[in-house]
Amino acid sequence: MNATKFVVLLVIGILCAIVTARQVKDLSTETKLGASLPKTTTKGIGAQLSATGTTYSTSSVVSYANGFNNPKGPGANSFESANTFTSGQVTAKGRKARVSSTSASAAEGDAAAAVTRKAAAARANGKVASASRVKGSSEKKKGKGKKD
């Protein structure tokens, strides 16, 4: 190893040692999270009014049936699978913010197959249903002197 390579590696090693030897400063929770929650007032200036609702619903059914007769003899197979998934999220801020979120899924399926030496029959059925509903409002402060 020549002298130039040795000096370069030595300098890199010293810089790495300096960087790793620094102490980590304590950070506030606000800085660590990278976000701060805004303060709201109840007098109207700076008050936050929002209502958010999301919902997702999905259903799936796979039904498969097979009946066959081949030289080795009759055979049959069937397969059925049903999946449902629902999720919802509700966010409400400020005065009188209301949100409701409902989600429902249903999946049903059946499959059957039968064979004899002379005939083969197969049947497959599937039903799915999904429903989602989101309702939300964020009422503003009523004006003085007005009655509803």
UniProtKB/Swiss-Prot annotation:
GO terms for biological process: mucilage biosynthetic process; seed coat development. Residues 123-132 have a biased composition (Low complexity). GO terms for cellular component: apoplast. This is UPF0540 protein At1g62000. Residues 123-148 are annotated as: Disordered. Belongs to the UPF0540 family. Keywords: Signal. Residues 1-21 form the signal peptide.
